[in-house]
Amino acid sequence: MLIIETLPLLRQQIRRLRMEGKRVALVPTMGNLHDGHMKLVDEAKARADVVVVSIFVNPMQFDRPEDLARYPRTLQEDCEKLNKRKVDLVFAPSVKEIYPNGTETHTYVDVPGLSTMLEGASRPGHFRGVSTIVSKLFNLVQPDIACFGEKDFQQLALIRKMVADMGFDIEIVGVPIMRAKDGLALSSRNGYLTAEQCQIAPGLYKVLSSIADKLQAGERDLDEIIAIAGQELNEKGFRADDIQIRDADTLLEVSETSKRAVILVAAWLGDARLIDNKIVELA
């Protein structure tokens, strides 16, 4: 497994792979890898000849400096996991390598609408940072496919739109959420939880599933469903942050013509902001 930290060396390897006619898959990550990331890697391996995993804690997508400072950097452990998975290439650049003149004056990519709605409304600049680094990685790696987790539902929708709008010839693969046996979605943020909070955390998925059951049963008073769900989260020990029920295909409000709904839930548990989602077919 090659570990590359600089742009010139990465370009050299990508040119070689292209000359050999290899089909390349990219799995962009910020490191602190868990089994959910490994599921992305496995999907990439099944679809391509060569798998490139990027590990880069992107400062442009953090709206709070304290979150950037405390994000775990576990490069050695991450590379050991990826080597066992027989990943071909790890791209682990420094911030200076990606943003040589800092982030303030760096050219950015913005996806109108999707960048500022829902999750983007409470995290200004976050999705602009995501779309900028992902587009840069696409230009550098030139993958045939790229794999992203469906847990970050809005992020996946944003990347799909960016790829369509910018004409990237890349297949975007959404990989289903990987969950623990108790239903908790695997996430790097789970590492912030105390032992006691780990016992509470699965309650998020229980509330999410309760909302889904109501929608499938034909309930359509969305305001009431959301209000009850928020109350249930707070009673379980969370601080409900945002609960949305949207059209799964547009992320706009559910209408009479909506065929699928996506339930988006965000809640604080201690210092960890947990997110989850579930898609429901509407009768």
From Swiss-Prot:
Organism domain of life: Bacteria
Catalytic activity, as annotated: (R)-pantoate + beta-alanine + ATP = (R)-pantothenate + AMP + diphosphate + H(+)
GO CC, one annotated term: cytosol
Compartments reported by the entry: Cytoplasm
Keyword terms, alphabetized: ATP-binding, Cytoplasm, Ligase, Nucleotide-binding, Pantothenate biosynthesis
InterPro entries tied to this protein: Cyt_trans-like (IPR004821), Pantoate_ligase (IPR003721), Pantoate_ligase_C (IPR042176), Rossmann-like_a/b/a_fold (IPR014729)
Protein residues bound to ATP: 30-37, 149-152, 186-189
Annotated GO biological process: pantothenate biosynthetic process
EC number(s) reported in the record: 6.3.2.1
Alphabetized Pfam families for the sequence: Pantoate_ligase
Record bears the keyword Nucleotide-binding: yes
Residues the record lists as binding beta-alanine: Q61
Active-site residues per Swiss-Prot or TrEMBL entry: H37 (proton donor)
Residue positions binding (R)-pantoate: Q61, Q155
Metabolic or biological pathway: Cofactor biosynthesis; (R)-pantothenate biosynthesis; (R)-pantothenate from (R)-pantoate and beta-alanine: step 1/1
Single GO term (MF): ATP binding
Other comment: The reaction proceeds by a bi uni uni bi ping pong mechanism.
Family statement drawn from the similarity comment of this UniProt entry: Belongs to the pantothenate synthetase family.
Quaternary organization: Homodimer.
Free-text function comment from the UniProt entry: Catalyzes the condensation of pantoate with beta-alanine in an ATP-dependent reaction via a pantoyl-adenylate intermediate.
Protein name: Pantothenate synthetase
Gene this chain is encoded by: panC
